A protein has these predicted regions:
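Boundary/entry segment of secreted carbohydrate-active catalytic domains
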Residues: 2-21
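Surface-exposed amphipathic alpha-helices with a cationic face
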Residues: 2-3, 30-31, 95-110
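Hydrophobic faces of well-ordered beta-strands that scaffold small-molecule active sites
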Residues: 9-13, 38-40, 109-111
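Active-site-proximal loop/turn and secondary-structure-junction residues that shape catalytic pockets
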Residues: 15-17, 44-46, 113
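Residue-level marker of alpha-helix boundaries and capping positions
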Residues: 16-17, 88-89, 102
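Short alpha-helical segments and helix-capping/turn motifs at coil-helix boundaries
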Residues: 21-27, 93-98
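Catalytic domains of carbohydrate-active enzymes, especially glycoside hydrolases
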Residues: 24-48
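Aromatic- and acidic-residue-enriched carbohydrate-binding clefts of CAZyme catalytic domains
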Residues: 48-92
Length: 113
């Protein structure tokens, strides 16, 4: 488990922010703000989010309890299954690209649970 410490100055964000604004815009926001980490949620409850900064949508309702990653086979074997978000068809590629961009810019990437 990654613990926040005095050296972590993080942007907490949602996958829909990265998808809507783009990887480079998120990385740029972290750097311009003097931050060194991104904490991004991997699972979230329902709600209504106002997104005045977004050019794609002004309000977003996430899928209740959705996962923002492809779970292991263990997940498929149980009766209680959180839905996998349909924001993207390829969560593995989403995480690979975000991880790569963070590494290139010396930004720590952490899961916000």
């Amino acid at each position: 488990m990654v613990k926040m410490n005095k050296k972590d100055l993080a942007l907490f964000c949602y996958p829909w922010d990265v998808i809507d604004e783009g990887y480079d815009a998120i990385i740029d926001a972290v750097k311009r703000s003097g931050l060194n980490s991104i904490y991004i949620t991997v699972n979230y409850h329902s709600g209504m989010f106002f997104l005045p900064h977004s050019t794609k949508r002004k309000i977003y309702f996430p899928e209740p309890g959705a996962l923002y990653f492809n779970p292991s086979d263990w997940h498929k074997k149980h009766s209680f299954q959180s839905p996998i978000s349909n924001l993207t068809k390829n969560w593995n590629l989403f995480w690979e690209k975000l991880s790569s961009k963070c590494k290139q810019n010396n930004i720590k990437l952490c899961a916000w649970i």
